[in-house]
Amino acid sequence: MIKAVCFDLDGTLVDSERLYLAGNVHAAQQMGYLLTCEDFLPLVGISDAQFQSQLNLLIDPGQQAEFAQLTQDFVDARIDRPESLAQPGADALLRALKLQQIKLALVTTSTAEYTHHMLQNTHWSDVFDVVITREQGRTKPAPDLYLQAMSQLNLPKAQILAVEDSPVGVRSAKAADLTCVQVQDLAPRSHLADELIDNLFELEKMIHA
């Protein structure tokens, strides 16, 4: 019986990845690069090292600080719109699980500052029992962040479900020996996922099946 669910943030609960893709294209165009969303799509849902390697193929390393700032400025101007952030079904799912006394953990490789800002904007600051961010261990696909969450949840691993949208996230959860569901979106399908679903509406039915 599932007594806790660990959620990834970006791409799983919030549609921030599309926002960052748009920001990447905007920044690149501002800097004179003729790049599209398709060019930046390989950057979605990968490890930090892979991200840097892919970015080096697109943006000159000497211009990456400017590129990052322009991207972040684009995102910051739009991130305060909660109605455009949450993935379909996310808010209702979190509220329903909370009412059913299922513990909720957020396990993300995003920074604590970004994460708490996002939780405020989506009105989820009071939802999660545990929040784990990139400052608390090696980032995904290492299992560290999930192990931190498991320690704080203090439940047998068989009673904890992980929910991710990317192969890197799934690898992290599986490395922590958790059952993991992948919500398919922009990132490729993972062969390691225990279950694949198309959206969050399917998840509550699965938990109580």
Question: Where do the language-model regions lie?
Answer:
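Metal-dependent phosphoesterase signature
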Residues: 54-92
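Short, acidic loop-to-helix structural element flanking the phosphoryl-transfer center
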Residues: 77-106, 116, 143
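Active-site neighborhood of HAD-like aspartate-dependent phosphohydrolases
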Residues: 1-42
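Conserved phosphate-coupling serine/threonine residues in phosphotransfer and NTP-handling enzymes
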Residues: 12, 108-110
